[in-house]
């Protein structure tokens, strides 16, 4: 897909401040809802240390993606000059200007070997599967807790009845599973079939609701701490909670797959590395405030933090409205995002099939087509009809698998913290750390050997030494081992 932004004009562009705000909104997603529980489980000092280091590693990887993006633009610039026999303009710093959006998948196709390319696609696919499982768990669990009796009074079990007056068969888990089926089959399946994606109005609505929800949660927890004192006293560190904390930390700083879509339209990229570092710092402070207030304000933090604000019946009307708004917040935001992730996942399967079993004349698609899905009005059926390609059993099995597997995982467990930690720890590590390292290593080599010009200092990541790539790789490997040991029950 081609970008709507013309490289020579300003159509579709925005100021650097707006672009940085988009980056902030992209990072601060619903993954933050699992952080307070992870903070309380792992301890406040370990949580602050790990989240700080994870944020720094995530920032380093983000600069790698931006540097690879500049090299990709130089490759396209050289290709255009060759096509038009423009031998006057030589390779130079200006060719590395980020003027055209090149998705992560396109950069992978430019720079990586077939093995690394397939690895990148599979990493994204597994990560998106985890994303869908988190979505199809968070929404039904929020709905179940709205319908069932409040969870703040006592610690409840999934086997407890939804209401004391209801039949025993209608346990909280039964009601939760009912909402899983309703959410996937009744709500999401029609949107996926119809190819419905997020519109600008829905994007504005979800952004406003996200800001309102996070500000309300921080304010309410702070008020509770100031009036009632700390309800819980988390330890400074608890290494047994390392696994869930690390996975949530990776998941909370995930933005790398969408960096090209946000950086390219900026009218100026002056000092972009430094300003993105400021964004990461602000996000870190925001996460610390949200997580620490929640970890100390509530005796038992829920894995979906918004559920802690479902008060007893004796609260005022204003508090009740706020509480139910917070409980509905994940339902509103995730329902609008589910079809985008599902359609992106379906497209990724098709791309992997084309890589492994190539067809003559088959058009390559982007690895992450969330933005392109909005711009492309043709459905898959219309494209296939135009190209004369009838539906195959693969075209039927893939959408079925995309919806069925995450739904099955959600039916097995309602532990969103577990799903977020696994998704962030394994495929998330590949998406956030491994793929950027592979891209920047190959892009730097391509710039020296093929373009015969080093990446200009303006477009260079501040982390040029191979030490940083080795550090990220070592950190990712160590963390994955720690997570695996925690999952199998090894005590520290």
UniProtKB/Swiss-Prot annotation:
GO cellular component: membrane
Coiled-coil stretches noted in the UniProt entry, renumbered to this chain: none
Keywords for the protein's UniProt record, in alphabetical order: Glycoprotein, Membrane, Transmembrane, Transmembrane helix
Domain of life: Eukaryota
The keyword Nucleotidyltransferase belongs to this UniProt entry's keyword annotation: no
Classification via InterPro entries: AA_transpt_TM
Membrane disposition: Multi-pass membrane protein
Stretches assigned to the Extracellular side: 40-45, 136-177, 232-238, 297-325, 413-415, 488-492
Region: Disordered, residue numbers: 367-387
Acidic residues composition-biased segments: 367-382
Cytoplasmic topological domain residue ranges: 1-18, 67-114, 199-210, 260-275, 347-391, 437-466
Cellular location(s): Membrane
Glycosylated position list: 152, 314
Chain segments annotated as transmembrane: 19-39, 46-66, 115-135, 178-198, 211-231, 239-259, 276-296, 326-346, 392-412, 416-436, 467-487
Similarity comment: Belongs to the TMEM104 family.
Name assigned to this protein: Transmembrane protein 104 homolog
Organism the protein comes from: Caenorhabditis briggsae
């Amino acid at each position: 897909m081609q970008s709507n932004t013309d490289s020579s004009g300003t159509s579709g562009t925005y100021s650097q401040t707006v672009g940085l705000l988009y980056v902030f909104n992209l990072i601060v997603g619903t993954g933050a809802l699992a952080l307070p529980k992870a903070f309380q489980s792992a301890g406040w000092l370990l949580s602050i240390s790990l989240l700080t280091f994870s944020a720094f590693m995530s920032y380093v990887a983000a600069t790698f993606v931006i540097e690879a993006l500049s090299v990709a633009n130089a490759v396209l610039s050289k290709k255009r000059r060759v096509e038009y026999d423009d031998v006057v303009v030589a390779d130079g710093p200006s060719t590395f200007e980020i003027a055209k959006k090149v998705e992560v998948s396109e950069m992978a196709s430019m720079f990586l070997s077939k093995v690394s390319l397939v690895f990148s696609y599979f990493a994204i696919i597994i990560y998106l599967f985890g994303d869908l499982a988190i979505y199809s768990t968070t929404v039904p669990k929020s709905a179940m807790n709205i319908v069932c009796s409040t969870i703040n009074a006592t610690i409840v079990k999934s086997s407890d009845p939804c209401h004391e007056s209801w039949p025993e068969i209608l346990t909280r888990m039964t009601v939760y599973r009912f909402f899983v089926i309703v959410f996937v089959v009744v709500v999401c399946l029609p949107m996926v079939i119809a190819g419905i994606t997020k519109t600008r109005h829905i994007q504005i609505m979800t952004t406003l609701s996200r800001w309102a929800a996070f500000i309300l949660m921080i304010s309410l927890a702070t008020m509770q701490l100031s009036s009632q004192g700390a309800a819980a006293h988390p330890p400074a560190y608890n290494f047994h909670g390392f696994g869930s904390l690390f996975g949530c930390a990776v998941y909370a700083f995930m933005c790398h797959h969408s960096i090209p879509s946000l950086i390219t339209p900026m009218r100026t990229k002056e000092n972009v590395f430094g300003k993105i570092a400021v964004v990461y710092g602000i996000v870190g402070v925001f996460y610390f405030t949200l997580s620490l207030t929640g970890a100390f304000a509530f005796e038992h933090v829920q894995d979906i933090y918004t559920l802690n604000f479902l008060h007893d019946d004796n609260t005022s009307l204003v508090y009740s409205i706020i509480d139910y708004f917070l409980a509905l917040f994940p339902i509103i935001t995730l329902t609008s995002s589910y079809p985008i992730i599902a359609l992106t996942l379906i497209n990724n399967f098709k791309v992997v099939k084309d890589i492994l079993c190539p067809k003559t004349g088959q058009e390559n698609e982007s690895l992450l087509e969330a933005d392109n899905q909005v711009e492309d009005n043709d459905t898959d059926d219309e494209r296939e009809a135009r190209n004369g390609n009838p539906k195959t059993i693969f075209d039927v099995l893939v959408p079925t698998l995309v919806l069925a597997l995450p739904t099955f995982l959600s039916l097995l467990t309602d532990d969103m913290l577990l799903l977020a930690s696994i998704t962030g720890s394994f495929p998330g590590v590949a998406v956030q750390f491994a793929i950027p390292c592979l891209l920047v290593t190959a892009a730097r080599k391509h710039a020296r050997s093929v373009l015969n010009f080093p990446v200009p200092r303006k477009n260079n990541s501040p982390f040029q030494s191979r030490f940083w790539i080795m550090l990220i790789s070592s950190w990712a490997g160590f963390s994955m081992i720690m997570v695996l040991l925690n999952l199998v029950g090894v005590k520290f």
